[in-house]
């Protein structure tokens, strides 16, 4: 449930993929909307905002996170080139990142591997203790 996930995000790092991306946005006050045409297949170009690099991504979803009234605690990290929808986000103060595509599908040999590397670096920054009940 959303409350349980919200509680987890208060004390644990998280990497949201696809629906997880949308859920993280909702937890922090973001909104989603139904796409006119869903993103399907392994050829969706996504731009990493910081580097300007464009990656081919594998996607399969019919909703997207809205950039309107975007949560103040989150930064947009990736945008879909085809329709300028939010394809990645990062929490400003917590080790929480998410992407709207399937980096584990890797259309190329190492195209999106850096997402996992970035998350590993985030969680290595401190020692994490899982509270009883999670």
Which residues does each PLM region occupy?
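Active-site donor-binding loop signature of nucleotide-sugar glycosyltransferases
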Residues: 37, 48, 81, 91, ...
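Cysteine-nucleophile active-site neighborhood
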Residues: 1-56, 64, 109-118, 122
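Catalytic beta-strand/loop cores that center a nucleophilic Ser/Cys/Thr
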Residues: 53-94, 132
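Hydrophobic/aromatic beta-strand patches that form the interior of the parallel beta-sheet core
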Residues: 15, 33, 58, 77, ...
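A glycine-centered loop/beta-turn motif at secondary-structure junctions
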Residues: 88-124, 128-131
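Active-site glycine-centered loops adjacent to acidic/histidine catalytic or metal-binding residues
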Residues: 18, 61, 102
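Flexible, glycine-rich phosphate/dinucleotide-binding loops
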Residues: 41, 85, 105
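Acidic/polar loop patches that form or flank catalytic/metal-binding clefts of enzymes
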Residues: 33-35, 128-133
């Amino acid at each position: 449930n959303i409350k349980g996930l919200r509680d987890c995000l208060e004390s644990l790092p998280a990497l949201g993929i696809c629906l997880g991306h949308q859920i993280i946005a909702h937890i922090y006050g973001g909104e989603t909307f139904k796409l006119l045409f869903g993103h399907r297949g392994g050829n969706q170009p996504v731009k990493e905002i910081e580097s300007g690099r464009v990656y081919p991504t594998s996607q399969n979803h019919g909703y997207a996170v809205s950039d309107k009234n975007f949560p103040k605690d989150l930064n947009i990290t990736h945008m879909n080139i085809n329709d300028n929808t939010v394809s990645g986000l990062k929490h400003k103060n917590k080790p929480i990142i998410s992407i709207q595509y399937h980096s584990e599908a890797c259309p190329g040999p190492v195209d999106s591997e850096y997402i996992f590397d970035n998350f590993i670096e985030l969680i290595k920054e401190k020692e994490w203790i899982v509270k009883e009940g999670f």
